[in-house]
Amino acid sequence: MEKIYLSDSGPKVSPAIYGFYRWTTEAPNTQATMEKIVNLCLELGINTFDHADIYGSYQCEEIFGNLISSKSFKREDIVLFTKCGLRLPHSTQPGVRVKHYDTSSEHILKSVDNSLLKLRTDYIDIFLLDHLDPLSSLEETALTLAKLKDSGKVKNIGVTNFSVFQHQLLASYLRVPIVTNHIELNLLNTAALDNGQVDYIKQRYMRPLASAPLAGGRIATGTDEQAIRVRRKLVEIAKKYNADIESIAVAWLIKFGALPLIGTTNEQRIRNIVNAFTLDLDRQDWYELYDASKGEV
């Protein structure tokens, strides 16, 4: 996979990104599974990996860091995302009673240092805020992010699940560019195409980063009316391209410039997503799928 710029401010990333947002460390042999998945991604040309402090019950970063320290691959050959902001109750977080958001300076600085330690690295390529915390001072948050970038601990700044206005609001306080906004976007959730999020991302010369590109498996196995309707259309169009429905679903995202954020541990699904980059849906096929999603068939 040829690397591309995430925004006009950089950095270069693989066109597909692997994220650990669906991982659970309760599964057996988590480290062996992660090593297998990471090696598969690298083999397929995916060198960009998305983390958060909370993923895998606050343990995924550390497991990935073990892979870095074991020299399974070179740190300079991969691009690392991580994020903070969402806080969840867990035995390792005794002060957290309820799910809440925290983008205070104190929490951001502590989270970055913890992530660097767990990931066994001295810099994060892209650090993201997970949602906007209405109780934190935006000026303080922006100054903290700029300080982290100036220190070299963080190379770029991004956000996750920000509305258009939230994106604009934080950007107005920042003196460094926001290079990405992770948004949920797939054939079963096209809201970002209709509410201005995708348009604003493009206006800022960024690429939409689509999390849950297969809708958490619903595209292939969902039993609700929308999933069945979209899957029927995917099967029809897949025959034309001699491809599977998952590849077509991701090709639909790629067509308007979105980068799929993969979360599955199913190796064949990862390969299907990568295969989507060999397809080029024609305009009318794209709109047929869009209409099927909205129930306008």
Language model segments and positions:
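N-terminal binding-site loop/beta-alpha segment at the start of enzyme catalytic domains
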Residues: M1-I78, D122
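Beta/alpha (TIM)-barrel catalytic core signal, keyed to glycine-rich beta->alpha loops juxtaposed to Asp/Glu
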Residues: K3, L132-V297
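Acidic (Asp/Glu)-rich catalytic clusters
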Residues: S7-G10, L67-R75, L116-R120, K149, ...
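N-terminal small/glycine-rich loop or linker at the start of catalytic domains
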Residues: D8-E26, F81-K99, L128
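Short, well-ordered coil/turn segments that N-cap beta-strands
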Residues: P11-A16, G45-N47, K74-I78, T121-D125, ...
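Short, acidic/polar
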Residues: P28-C41, T103-L119, H167-Q168
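Alpha-helix N-cap and loop-to-helix initiation/capping positions
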Residues: N29-T33, Q59, I63, V96-H107, ...
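Active-site groove signature of glycoside hydrolases
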Residues: L116-D133
